[in-house]
């Protein structure tokens, strides 16, 4: 017995990478699948690449409402039992589909399977292992430990609990995992399934302030309060971006606490008063904790998280 996979790729001006994505999908074996690419009207070499493979996949190129809208369109245009969503700059590793199919076939109660992924550079070279963790929904609220191309889910999840939130620009995958995870436990497959492209021009890395703002906003809407970990992550990104604007090398700053302290120098009038008290390591630690706490509550008041 086999399951039919539906593979969906949203695309926009990723001509330098999309052929590698396509080849990684078409190289999958022992699994029946159909492949749909929803392009948003690319103006680079993307369409030439798609035409090259059009006898082995389906594609459409037209204006859309963004990445989430393109994925939703692809899901609606396919009929497979298992949905695999991979962006146009990522890759699957050999036998990924067959490994995932084995779980879905032998454990019919499992609705979502996820595995390990690598961060890779523009030349497909290994950077680091994505920090995937065993399933824990409470932990998922604190940190997104699922790498998007390494997640596969049954179509019934879409039918029962909806598709991607097309109003989100960055964290539509994280929101979907939180929504689905509230309904069922995900199966953690300890296998390397995908490579996620990690470079400066990726949407997530290139717009970090907007990404973290949207994540906090989404979490507040879903859980009425954004976890402290995400608020402080947003604070750290704000400080780093501020340093870049000032033309300084963020990597040379000593610690995250120092970054936050410096940011607070402009945010709080009491900075000089408490800094003068920092005469011993223990006092410095107490002051740093106070700074972070005050900054944390100030940030919540400013961004309403």
Where are these regions (language model features)?
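Conserved donor NDP-sugar-binding/catalytic core segment of glycosyltransferases
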Residues: 91, 95-127
């Amino acid at each position: 017995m086999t399951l039919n996979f539906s593979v969906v790729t949203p695309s926009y001006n990723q001509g330098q990478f999309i052929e590698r994505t396509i080849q990684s999908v078409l190289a999958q074996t022992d699994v029946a699948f159909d492949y749909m690419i929803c392009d948003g009207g690319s103006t680079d070499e993307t369409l030439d690449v798609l035409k090259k493979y059009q006898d082995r996949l389906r594609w459409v190129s037209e204006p859309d409402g963004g990445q989430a809208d393109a994925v939703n369109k692809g899901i609606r245009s396919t009929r497979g039992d298992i949905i695999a969503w991979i962006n146009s700059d990522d890759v699957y590793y050999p036998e990924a589909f067959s490994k995932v199919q084995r779980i879905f076939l032998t454990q019919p109660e499992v609705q979502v399977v996820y595995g390990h992924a690598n961060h890779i550079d523009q030349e497909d070279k290994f950077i680091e292992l994505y920090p995937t963790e065993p399933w824990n929904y409470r932990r998922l609220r604190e940190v997104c430990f699922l790498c998007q191309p390494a997640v596969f889910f049954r179509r019934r999840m879409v039918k029962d609990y909806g598709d991607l939130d097309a109003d989100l620009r960055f964290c539509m995958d994280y929101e979907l995992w939180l929504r689905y995870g509230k309904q069922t436990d995900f199966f953690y497959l300890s296998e390397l399934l995908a490579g996620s492209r990690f470079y400066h021009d990726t949407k997530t890395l290139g717009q970090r302030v907007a990404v973290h703002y949207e994540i906090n906003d989404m979490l507040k809407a879903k859980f009425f309060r954004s976890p402290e970990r995400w608020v402080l992550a947003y604070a750290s990104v704000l400080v780093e971006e501020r340093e870049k604007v000032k033309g300084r090398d963020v990597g040379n700053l000593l610690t995250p606490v120092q970054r936050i302290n410096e940011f607070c120098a402009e945010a709080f009038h009491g900075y000089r008063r408490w800094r003068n008290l920092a005469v011993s390591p223990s006092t410095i630690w107490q002051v740093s904790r106070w700074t972070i706490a005050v900054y944390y509550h100030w940030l919540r008041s400013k961004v309403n998280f």
